[in-house]
């Protein structure tokens, strides 16, 4: 006669206790936002380390070339300030808006969002980490462009420290917009097109002086988040900058950045569950 241990019998008390213990096992703690964001940020920096030099070369020398071309057209004064400020912010738009839209568009089309969905990181960390990494790529190019423009047009460089605030705030606004465009576009080709159109709008409406634009075009210019970064830089080139207006422009960049990154996070959640 074979003997069966009591603990393996379905109706035994031991089996019930073990089943309850397994069912009551707790999940691990949820990943916190800040450590997850830093991890995604470092991963994005490492991923793009090889492509960073040619990326900065293209973004920077594109803006420098535009300033050289405009040197023979613009005499000085407010027009020169607009050209230098617009060319500096264009570096941010090229990377944070254009390239980030392409990146998220390709990531969605290739199924890369499924990989991020399996990681124990909040959706906001993925969007903010990628946006922060792409925005940080623009720091050297923006500084070089602004300094070169000041030398080329004879503008003062005493207040270029305002770039410390303009780059992250304008970068957040444009990166959030680029991420949202890439995640909401149904096809990667459309995401690339939208990113290119956004960068072109930042170029044309940021470099050209606003007082020469028609009223309709000027209204469109006011809708772009890059405009307020351009205005903040351009105001500091004056003899006596009105810092209240500068802070107002930076505040608009910050609000638009918060809203655009929130929309991008929602778009990431929407795309990841499909």
Named regions from a protein language model:
Residues 1-144, 149-153, 165-173, 177, ...:
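Hydrophobic transmembrane alpha-helices and immediately adjacent juxtamembrane helices
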Residues 158-159:
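Interfacial aromatic-anchored transmembrane helix boundaries in multi-pass membrane proteins
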């Amino acid at each position: 006669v074979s003997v069966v241990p009591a603990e393996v019998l379905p109706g035994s008390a031991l089996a019930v206790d073990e089943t309850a213990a397994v069912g009551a096992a707790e999940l691990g703690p949820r990943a916190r936002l800040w450590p997850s964001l830093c991890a995604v940020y470092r991963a994005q920096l490492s991923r793009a380390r090889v492509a960073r030099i040619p990326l900065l070369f293209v973004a920077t020398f594109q803006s420098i070339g535009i300033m050289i071309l405009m040197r023979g057209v613009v005499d000085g004064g407010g027009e020169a300030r607009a050209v230098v400020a617009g060319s500096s912010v264009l570096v941010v738009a090229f990377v944070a808006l254009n390239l980030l839209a392409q990146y998220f568009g390709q990531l969605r089309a290739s199924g890369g969002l499924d990989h991020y969905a399996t990681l124990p990181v909040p959706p906001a960390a993925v969007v903010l980490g990628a946006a922060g990494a792409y925005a940080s790529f623009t720091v050297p190019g923006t500084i070089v462009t602004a300094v070169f423009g000041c030398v080329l047009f004879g503008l003062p460089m005493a207040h270029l420290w305002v770039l410390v605030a303009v780059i992250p705030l304008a970068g957040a606004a444009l990166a959030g917009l680029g991420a949202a465009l890439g995640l909401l576009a149904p096809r990667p080709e459309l995401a690339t097109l939208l990113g290119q159109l956004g960068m072109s709008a930042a170029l044309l409406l940021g470099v050209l002086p606003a007082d020469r634009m028609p009223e309709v075009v000027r209204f469109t210019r006011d809708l772009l988040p890059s405009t307020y970064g351009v205005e903040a830089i351009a105001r500091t080139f004056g003899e006596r900058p009105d810092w209240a207006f500068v802070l107002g422009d930076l505040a608009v960049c910050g609000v638009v950045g918060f809203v655009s990154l929130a929309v991008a996070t929602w778009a990431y959640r929407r795309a990841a569950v499909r």
